[in-house]
């Protein structure tokens, strides 16, 4: 990486890490975040942390957090750190600084960088896998394909999100190697398969010893395959929250459409190539998974979809005024959404007993000063007893 590029990468990563760390939740978290705090800090049952399935254990995340963290805030800072790396990785893919800043300020990424979750770490893998894919498509060098396969294999150890883009990667590699000769094709796919298997060795071991269902979906098969009945109130709430992350892509797509309608557009050098087709395919795969995954926290699964949406409009260059306007919109819209959701007569968005205001908690990405989970656990059952057991089989009795 050239010195100038690495300097900008580090400045962007450090800047957003500072933002996320300052606005992150200091104490215990709710729901899955509280479960991560409990498992990482209190459970010593191997990398699975006592989970009832490999699919929900996220062993790579657990291993990193356990080796570095001794307090709930430190566990949350893992999300902040990888959220910042994801922003910097997006910039490496797009080379559009203004849009990278807008992406870093988007609702879902900021929100998930302030709580204990695995999704920002997963997004960092997505960013660098995309970078390696684009480098391979541009150069046709085998090293980039092998690096992509190895990185995706390690990603599988973190989250099954990594399996979604595999068909796109395989088709892109096959199309790029078409006509290269049987020997080169065999070597390319053989080395890539070996690299992927090396990266995913623990996942493959779990697959062999625990079975396909345990590794892929665990007890969440109905949700993963979209077989459960939909709660349209919750779905509407999640779509509204997810929409807060697409301000910049929609604005830039509208601007590009207007510009294209008013004058003939000049051909973009890389737009017609395979990279553009791959980005669209990756967007479609992740968007399809997201829209039919009806769970209470559905909006937290929107990050890869938002990443590719931002990347596809990254070629639209922004002046300083428009960049500042987009940043202001990203900052103000959560406040507007909070007020709107709080004013609607929907029980799911009203304050949750005396501890948590649902509209505020989900609409505002920053979590500094939010000690609602600490107060709930301490008042009801003690600092840790209000959280799930190591197996994660039951939510908190009084603080679900």
Where are these regions (language model features)?
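Transmembrane-helix motifs of polytopic, lipid-linked glycan transferases
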Residues: 10, 77-97, 128-132, 311-312
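Signature aromatic-anchored transmembrane alpha helix within multi-pass, membrane-resident enzymes
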Residues: 10, 97-101, 190, 194, ...
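Extracytoplasmic catalytic/substrate-binding loops of multi-pass membrane glycan-assembly enzymes
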Residues: 23-38, 48-64, 73
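Short acidic/glycine- and proline-prone juxtamembrane loop motifs at membrane-interface regions
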Residues: 31, 111-119
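Transmembrane alpha-helices of multi-pass, membrane-embedded glycan-processing enzymes
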Residues: 57, 61, 65-69, 75-89, ...
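Membrane-interface alpha helices of multi-pass inner-membrane proteins
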Residues: 100-101, 144-159
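Transmembrane-lumen/periplasm boundary regions of multi-pass, lipid-linked membrane glycan transferases
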Residues: 119, 170-174, 185-261
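Hydrophobic/aromatic-rich transmembrane helices and adjacent perimembrane loops
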Residues: 164, 292-318
């Amino acid at each position: 990486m050239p010195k100038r590029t690495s300097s900008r990468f580090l400045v962007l990563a450090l800047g957003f890490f500072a933002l996320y760390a300052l606005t992150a939740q200091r104490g215990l978290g709710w729901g899955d975040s509280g479960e991560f705090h409990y498992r990482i800090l209190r459970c010593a049952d191997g990398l699975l942390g006592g989970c009832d399935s490999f699919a929900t254990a996220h062993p790579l995340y657990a291993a990193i957090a356990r080796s570095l963290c001794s307090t709930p805030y430190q566990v949350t800072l893992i999300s902040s750190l990888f959220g910042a790396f994801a922003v910097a990785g997006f910039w490496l893919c797009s080379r559009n600084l203004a849009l990278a800043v807008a992406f870093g300020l988007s609702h879902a990424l900021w929100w998930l960088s302030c709580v204990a979750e695995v999704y920002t770490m997963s997004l960092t893998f997505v960013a660098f896998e995309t970078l390696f894919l684009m480098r391979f498509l541009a150069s046709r060098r085998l090293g980039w394909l092998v690096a992509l396969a190895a990185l995706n294999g390690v990603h599988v150890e973190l989250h099954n999100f990594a399996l979604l883009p595999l068909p796109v990667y395989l088709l892109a590699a096959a199309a790029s190697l078409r006509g290269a000769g049987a020997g080169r094709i065999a070597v390319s796919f053989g080395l890539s398969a070996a690299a992927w298997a090396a990266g995913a060795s623990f996942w493959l071991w779990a697959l062999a010893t625990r079975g396909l269902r345990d590794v892929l979906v665990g007890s969440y098969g109905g949700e993963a395959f979209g077989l459960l009945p939909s709660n349209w109130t919750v779905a509407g709430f999640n779509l509204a929250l997810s929409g807060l992350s697409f301000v910049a892509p929609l604005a830039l797509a509208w601007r590009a459409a207007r510009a294209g309608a008013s004058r003939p557009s000049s051909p973009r050098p890389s737009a017609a190539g395979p990279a553009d087709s791959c980005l669209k395919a990756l967007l479609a795969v992740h968007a399809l998974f997201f829209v039919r995954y009806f769970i209470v926290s559905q909006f937290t699964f929107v990050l890869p979809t938002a990443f590719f949406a931002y990347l596809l409009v990254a070629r639209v260059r922004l002046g300083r005024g428009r960049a500042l306007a987009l940043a202001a919109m990203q900052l103000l819209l959560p406040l507007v959404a909070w007020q709107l959701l709080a004013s609607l007569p929907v029980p799911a968005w009203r304050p949750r007993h005396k501890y948590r205001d649902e509209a505020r908690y989900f609409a505002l990405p920053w979590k500094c000063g939010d000690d609602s989970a600490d107060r709930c656990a301490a008042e009801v059952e003690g600092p840790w007893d209000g959280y799930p057991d190591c197996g994660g089989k039951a939510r908190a009795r009084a603080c679900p």
